[in-house]
Amino acid sequence: NNTQITNSSFTGTIVSNDKQGKEYNVGGLVANLKGGNSLISQSRADVTILAGARANNQRFGGLVGRLENNARISRSYVAGKIQNSTKNGQIGGVVGSNYFNGLIDNVISNVSGTNVYSISGDQGYENNRITEAYTVEGNTTLENDKFVTSTLTLNQAEEKLADLDITTTLE
């Protein structure tokens, strides 16, 4: 609760090799972000996530594993690869799950992978509050991510990224 992260970045690899199927959240910046005053803004990640989700309560996101209780991701960017060796879990380029009442606006997902959605891995949650969520063309992800606002060319994504005013670097 009450966590504020601004102009933060992460570059690296996260490997999950859980064999028991217990609930957990994994994110490039934060595992679980919750509470109305919690915010990730103007942040970015370049991640490789290697997952083998055993159950749907295992969540992986390029920025946040689970976003809930009015916590928010805004003006942020994620790139990289997420490989889920199973068809289980909630795996998303930006967030694993947005349940319950997380907010996402003005994000770009330049994530490719196996058994991963571009934006949110929780495609069954109908009350998602996701706006201005973009993916970059040419990335291999699961089709029909209902939370993608539109698909951008790489040039369009670079222009939009400049507008996000992210000053942190990945170096």
Question: Model-derived features: where do they sit?
Answer:
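Predominantly extracellular beta-rich ligand-binding scaffolds that present long acidic/polar faces
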Residues: 1-171
